[in-house]
Amino acid sequence: ADVGPRLFNDAKPANAEIIDCRGQVLAPGLIDMRVFTGEPGAEHRETLASAGASAAAGGVTSFVVMPVTEPVIDDAALVSFVARRAEATARVRVYPAGALTHGLKGTQMSEIGLLKEAGAIAFTDADRTIASSLIMRRCLAYAANYDALVIAHAEDPALAGAGSMNEGAFAARMGLGGIPPAAEAMAVERDMRLVELTGARYHLGQVSCAAALDVI
């Protein structure tokens, strides 16, 4: 629909319904690129239907399902299942992402071509970083052959250790293990080099520090 202050010459038609939107936000439907659900495998926690209802309530009209499920979405049949199930039960558009590596273990590349053919719109190991640069290069190069999008979580796992938030005074006050900005910046730097090398389509799942922005 058209919107704007000068949409009508006389400000508003005589028969127009006026909806007071003061204090509200008018925007296109939001898209969430990183949603974790319980279905398949943990429907007691959350289903595609309940996730879709929550999304709709918050103004999200489309979301991408991460492959962190039980079993992991690293098989064409599971991609098809998620797509069909979401279409039948969810109130919003749901797009399945396939696992970039088998079992999200970061050691063996998934069948990207078959997963994309089944309906996967992107490939990711979700909140896990592929530690091996060789495996990451192979994944990006193979994905490039299919014009497939790779979504990455960039964080050097060895340097991040058991940290749970960015390193700093707030983490110290909360008694939480900190993650140095270098852990993210180093991983982003590696991925940027590999993207340049392979020509793959790449989406950085999250950026949480200025050091990573400097690399980008």
Which positions does each model-derived feature cover?
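Histidine-rich, glycine-flanked metal-binding segment
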Residues: A1-G29
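Short, structurally constrained coil/turn elements
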Residues: K12, A88-A90, T198
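Generic detector of well-ordered alpha-helical packing
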Residues: C21, M33-P40, A126, A154
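Alpha-helical scaffold segments that flank or form the walls of functional sites
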Residues: Q24-V25, G41-V94, H102-I121, R137, ...
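Hydrophobic faces of well-ordered beta-strands that scaffold small-molecule active sites
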Residues: G29-V35, F63-V65, V94-G98, A122-T124, ...
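Glycine/charged-rich beta-loop-alpha catalytic/anionic-binding loops adjacent to active sites
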Residues: I31-G38, A171-G177
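Histidine/acidic residue-rich metal-binding segments in metalloenzymes
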Residues: T107-I216
